[in-house]
Curated annotation (Swiss-Prot):
Keywords carried by this UniProt record: RNA-binding, Transcription, Transcription antitermination, Transcription regulation
Recorded family membership: Belongs to the NusB family.
Disulfide bond residue pairs: none
Function: Involved in transcription antitermination. Required for transcription of ribosomal RNA (rRNA) genes. Binds specifically to the boxA antiterminator sequence of the ribosomal RNA (rrn) operons.
Lineage of the species this protein comes from: Bacteria, Bacillati, Bacillota, Bacilli, Bacillales
InterPro entries: NusB-like_sf, NusB_fam, NusB_RsmB_TIM44
Protein name: Transcription antitermination protein NusB
Coiled coil stretches, renumbered: none
Amino acid sequence: MKRRTARERAMQALYQMDITGELEPKVAVENTLDEGEETNEFLESLVVGFVENKEVIDEAIRQNLKKWKLERISIVDRSILRVAVYEMKYMEEIPHNVTINEAIEIAKTFGDEESRRFINGVLSNIKDTL
């Protein structure tokens, strides 16, 4: 599984967890996989890592929102931000610009017209604080 695909699956897993409020991370990951597709370590680390660091990640996002509340952001955008912020804070081997570009590309696919710019702005602000 390519890293872009893993990031997309991680975003989808966090989306499911946000909607249901009770899905276990491994179940959410399994729900995103195509038939016969296997998970990988990168995908699982993104989802489990977010769950283990949810408060820190959400606070980093909150501190960089202007005139928005985290709870009012679309679930898709919130999920993309959460995956990207986890990656930026805890996966130091991945350059921040790569993470931001990947998040923007995922937003183009899954978000609305404004998602791409919104996500770029928030992540750029967070990058400056790390």
